[in-house]
Amino acid sequence: PHKEVLGIPYDTPILGYLNNTANTLRLWRAEAPESFDFGVFNRGDYYGAVDHKISSENITKVLYPNDEAIEGKALRLEQQFFLVSASLQDMFRILDRQNIPVERFHEKFAAQMNDTHPALAVCELMRLLVDERHVPWDTAWEITQKSLAYTNHTLLPEALEQWPLALFSRLLPRHLEIIYEINDRFLEQVRVRYLGDPERVGRLSLINESGHRAVRMANLACVGSHAINGVAAMHSELVRTDL
């Protein structure tokens, strides 16, 4: 990987109301594996010796930075990936500790994606299963869909995130490869079901090909989930018909 970051967990107990139940809210802070690079320092780059520490900690310093500039967009994408990857890898850690086969991941865990901010969970879970655990693609896809659910809170365009392809490929090249593969398989099913309807194929694609090419995160979340809903019955119907 181009950059390695440590995810440091912080747990807060959440007490139930008038019962003996307490759940755990786990939040994450980003840190660099090494706080000081002596090799860079000894080459005379004194500020560069702490660059990795600063850039790593910036990931969780300020949530949702201004994304008008490309630097803000990049930091937002890093934040979303950090949350998703740290949480999913933590689930695999628990799975291993309890000696549960990876094929039963979906029996132990359910991940709820509220809006598109955590939608990278689809391709990151596939990466962890296929690349790290060597699970066959079809089995990994079944586990992924059974593990994930998506709630859409609004259909306003600004809430349906689309990441520029150039930025996505620079920061998450392997994940983009996985998205391409998911998209190819999904669109093949669409073409079979809706013969002679290229407009529908283009609308449902995970990649927006009009203008500046971009990854449609809402489409990715829908395709990778076993359950999709809105915040009300009417909203759920709009998600079904419009999204």
PLM-predicted stretches and their roles:
Residues 1-243:
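A conserved ligand/cofactor-binding region detector
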